[in-house]
């Protein structure tokens, strides 16, 4: 009979995280919600695609709402009460994601738009001709 292997090392303890940062990346095709602690370590994430939406439905406001609710539900179980929101991108799920975060019971202390805007940097892609 094989010897039983003893586990060496310390198990990760569940930390109580009272304050965090919610990063919402809203593109035209998808919405990704990532929740970190104040140091930047990821606690939970969700996206419209991970919630079961496919194709063009991923870019809808309802998909963004569902993704935000799923991500927030996990961190509320870990004890988070307040969060700052960093929102980036031009997508249609921006406002809906913020409303969903607030409705899920997470207190919002700050909303900051961190959408990168070039100071006339790279040449944009040519316009579509449909």
From Swiss-Prot:
| GO CC entries | chloroplast; ribonucleoprotein complex; ribosome
| Entry keyword annotation includes Ribosomal protein | yes
SUPFAM superfamilies recorded = Translational machinery components
GO BP, sorted A to Z: translation
Main localisation, per the record?
A: plastid
State the oligomer form and interacting partners.
Answer: Part of the 30S ribosomal subunit.
Q: Which domain of life is it from?
A: Eukaryota
The answer to whether keyword Calcium applies is no
The record lists the organism as: Mesostigma viride
One matching Pfam family, short form?
Ribosomal_S11
List keywords of the entry alphabetically.
Chloroplast, Plastid, Ribonucleoprotein, Ribosomal protein, RNA-binding, rRNA-binding
What is this protein identified as? Small ribosomal subunit protein uS11c
Offer an example of a GO molecular function term for this protein: structural constituent of ribosome
Q: Where in the cell is it found?
A: Plastid, Chloroplast
* Family affiliation: Belongs to the universal ribosomal protein uS11 family.
């Amino acid at each position: 009979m094989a010897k039983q292997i003893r586990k060496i090392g310390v198990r990760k303890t569940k930390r109580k995280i009272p304050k965090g940062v919610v990063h919402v990346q809203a593109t035209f095709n998808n919405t990704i919600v990532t929740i970190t602690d104040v140091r930047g370590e990821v606690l939970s994430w969700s996206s419209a695609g991970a919630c079961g939406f496919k194709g063009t439905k991923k870019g809808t406001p309802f998909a963004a709402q569902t993704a935000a609710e799923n991500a927030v539900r996990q961190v509320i179980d870990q004890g988070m009460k307040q969060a700052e929101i960093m929102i980036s991108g031009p997508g249609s799920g921006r406002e809906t994601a913020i409303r969903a975060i607030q409705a899920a019971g997470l207190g919002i202390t700050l909303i900051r738009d961190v959408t990168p805007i070039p100071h006339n940097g790279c040449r944009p892609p040519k316009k579509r001709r449909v």
